[in-house]
């Protein structure tokens, strides 16, 4: 076809390319554009995408392109934090499946997005001279299975991927405000006959902004006895949020509720906000109805590096279904927690904790026989000389023994077993694969799941009571993790985790686990 309704069309030669048509996109209006998330607009001859919260996209939909070259000039507004990314999308089959180049502060990362994962990395280059606040020219070409990425007229790399061959084009912003102009599309164009489809997402956001600075992290989810799900998480302005003028009490514990098995969530509310940075919360409802939220606290300390003191592990509880909460009680002054309290089959409570001294870390547990009113002295788990950061979670096995999984510092996590109800533990042994902040969960079929950070957000599963583990299963390409899981009413599993980076949010995905592996399920499909 010939494009005659836009500014100009010329025939040109591109390196290694056949004759192609060139379209200069008219940016005097938003005609032909689709902005699925909002936060994008045409303004003064520019496409403007505000990605300070979320990652807004803009698809140009009148035409589909094969053997395409997408070229544009872009600028990302300067900011102290955030990756300050502008992305170029090509071969968009729908709103979830496309190639894209992620131009951030100093990198150009070529990826493929699909229904299951938005970040299938193909190739990257770093150390680019690409300051924010300056206009740059980006370009991505896709001919057959060959992809090329350019910046400011220079070819950065060429690679191959056969997955996608044609579709729409577009742009996005990430953790910054991006401006795009001088958009030129070259290739074999044909008028699009169908609207751009947006398949249901494989994840939902539990919370994108709890009102404390738009940084949400370290989630934990459980089912309440009234059937609802509760997800607690840390809310602040960054990975550590000490009190300041904007957040006088520092980071806090927030929560959201779901009455539809995790598909939608209430706006965030504050569960606990002490005078310091309260973080890494976990939540459980005991058999007697008591709801306990455990967390740990950091207090600002000038002149130190890092600039805080740890105040240990704490808890608050509610005996009236969250109408009121107790005053905080300290569980331990020297140990910290990143996992939930577990109620054992005999009714006792056990909490995995951890400590570090002189560069050495180890896991530990503490026990309660009175529903959390008092806690035993901490029982250490010998790290066996392993380098552990040792965030510890516990699961009760079918034979009554207890299995502890511990965060690794180097190439592997650690594990230990107790055969006397948690009073003593075997020396930690290497699990054989890396992971941060493991979370253990048993499915209705008896499969034990262990979700963790590294690589990215991942999980393993065991069919033999933690004796052996599956190969790694990728959950998501975001790298925050600190995951948590709960069984839904249909037997599927909901996993929550966090994104990391400026504007980090809490995500949730749904899957079913069998002896054959893990199958991901759309979130909008009613459980």
Predicted regions and their residues:
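Secretory/extracellular carbohydrate-interaction modules
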Residues: 52-114
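Asp-box/BNR beta-propeller blade signature and adjacent active/binding-site loops
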Residues: 190-527
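Extracellular beta-strand elements of beta-rich domains used
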Residues: 27, 183-185
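Flexible glycan-contacting loops in extracellular carbohydrate-active proteins
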Residues: 159-179
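Short, aromatic/His-centered strand-loop micro-motif at the edge of beta-sheets
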Residues: 116-137
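Short carbohydrate-recognition loop motifs
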Residues: 38-56
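Short tryptophan-centered beta-strand motifs in secreted/extracellular beta-sheet-rich domains
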Residues: 70-72, 133-143, 147-149
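Extracellular carbohydrate-recognition regions
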Residues: 20-37, 192, 520-527
């Amino acid at each position: 076809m010939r494009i005659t309704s836009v500014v100009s069309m010329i025939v040109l030669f591109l390196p290694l390319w056949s004759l192609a048509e060139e379209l200069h996109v008219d940016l005097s209006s938003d005609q032909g554009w689709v902005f699925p998330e909002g936060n994008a607009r045409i303004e003064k001859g520019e496409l403007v995408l505000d990605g300070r919260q979320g990652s807004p996209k803009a698809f140009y939909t009148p035409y589909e392109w094969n053997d395409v070259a997408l070229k544009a000039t872009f600028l990302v507004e300067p900011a102290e934090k955030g990756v300050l990314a502008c992305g170029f999308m090509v071969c968009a089959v729908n709103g979830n499946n496309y190639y894209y180049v992620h131009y951030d502060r100093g990198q150009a990362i070529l990826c493929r997005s699909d229904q299951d994962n938005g970040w299938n990395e193909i190739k990257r280059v770093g150390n680019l001279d690409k300051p924010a606040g300056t206009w740059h020219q980006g370009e991505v070409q896709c001919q057959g299975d060959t992809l090329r990425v350019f910046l400011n007229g220079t070819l950065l790399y060429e690679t191959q991927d056969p997955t996608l061959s044609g579709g729409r084009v577009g742009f996005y912003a990430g953790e910054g405000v991006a401006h795009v102009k001088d958009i030129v599309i070259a290739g074999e164009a044909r008028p699009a006959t169908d609207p751009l489809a947006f398949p249901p997402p494989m994840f939902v956001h539990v919370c994108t902004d709890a009102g404390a600075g738009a940084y949400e992290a370290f989630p934990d989810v459980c089912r309440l006895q009234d059937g609802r799900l509760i997800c607690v998480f840390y809310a602040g302005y960054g990975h550590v949020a000490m009190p300041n003028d904007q957040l006088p009490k520092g980071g806090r514990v927030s929560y959201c509720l779901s009455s539809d098995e995790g598909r939608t969530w209430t706006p965030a509310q504050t569960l606990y906000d002490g005078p310091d940075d309260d973080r890494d919360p976990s939540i459980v409802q005991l058999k007697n109805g008591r709801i306990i939220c455990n967390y740990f606290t950091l207090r600002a300390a000038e002149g130190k590096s890092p600039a805080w003191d740890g105040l240990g592990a704490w808890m608050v509880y509610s005996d009236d279904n969250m109408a009121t909460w107790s005053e905080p009680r300290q569980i331990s002054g020297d140990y910290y927690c990143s996992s939930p309290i577990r109620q054992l089959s005999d009714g006792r409570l056990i909490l995995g904790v951890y400590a570090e001294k002189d560069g050495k870390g180890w896991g530990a547990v503490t026990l309660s026989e009175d529903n959390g009113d008092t806690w035993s002295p901490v029982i250490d788990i010998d790290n066996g000389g392993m380098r552990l950061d040792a965030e510890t979670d516990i699961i009760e096995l079918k034979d009554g023994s207890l299995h502890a999984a511990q965060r690794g510092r180097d190439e592997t996590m650690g594990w230990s077993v107790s055969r006397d109800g948690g009073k003593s533990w075997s020396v930690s042994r290497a699990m054989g694969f890396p992971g941060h902040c493991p979370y253990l969960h048993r499915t209705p079929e008896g499969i034990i799941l262990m979700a963790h950070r590294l690589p990215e957000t991942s999980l393993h599963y065991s069919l033999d009571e933690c004796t052996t583990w599956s190969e790694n299963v990728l959950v998501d390409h975001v790298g925050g993790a600190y995951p948590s899981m709960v069984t839904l009413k249909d037997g599927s599993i909901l996993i929550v985790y966090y994104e990391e980076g400026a504007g980090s949010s809490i995500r949730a995905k749904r899957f079913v686990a069998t002896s054959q592996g893990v199958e991901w399920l759309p979130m909008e499909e009613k459980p």
